[in-house]
Amino acid sequence: MNNQPILQVQEVTKAFGGVIAVNRVSLDVNEGEILGIIGPNGSGKTTLINCITGFIKMTSGKIFFRGKDITGKPVHKIADMGITRTFQIMRPYYSLPCYKNLVIPLFSPRAKRTGGWRGGGKLGDRDTVSIDILEEIGFERDSFVPYKLASTLPTGYLKRLELARCLAVKPEIIICDEIFSGLSMSEIASMVPLIERLQMDGITLIMIEHRLRELFRVSKRILVLNFGEKVIEGTPEEIMADEKVKEVYFGSEEVEEVMSHA
């Protein structure tokens, strides 16, 4: 790793008509870290990552990936650089078997160049690679689950399928939009070590999350947004101790509840 942030967001603003959803937000993401982004509903979290990933065009500002200006680049160009994401509302190909959901991204130019996740620069049989990835993120290889239609999967498996589709292209950054939402406590308990393992494998993660306890476990640096503006950036301990954050986001009772289980 070098000292330059892998991703730099500079003074990004996004306005929808007269409504400013994101207002001059700047942040640096260090290679290999897990950066958490939190804030109340409507605070601009998803809009910010939509700007980063090219899903919407920002009003002003700059975004750099490994020092290269990627401002205004289309979604497929940004994905080809290795910046991938999951969605709060999951978007699998519901009519296809799970493993076929991975075969499609394995046809991408990036997957062909890199060999896909664990590919070592050479892409093998796509069906086999798909099953290998699914097994690694928690699908039982010898069960029927990888071959089931995505439409039949419960939420826990769909969340893992979202991550698997990101891994298929051997990403450098995965942006997770509420990966813990809708999961049972046991599903969350098994998802946390998976996130930690992805970081150990060298992937940089940006996590938008409402499940604070779990986020604070995996992330050492948190950014708080409110009304489209950055409130504070710091460690989980600094975030929970900040009086302004308590007022605008948590409420003192919620902070105390999270702290008591930290």
Which residue ranges define each predicted feature?
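Conserved ABC transporter NBD signature motif
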Residues: G61-K68, M81, L134, Y147
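Helix-to-loop junction immediately C-terminal to a conserved catalytic motif
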Residues: T53
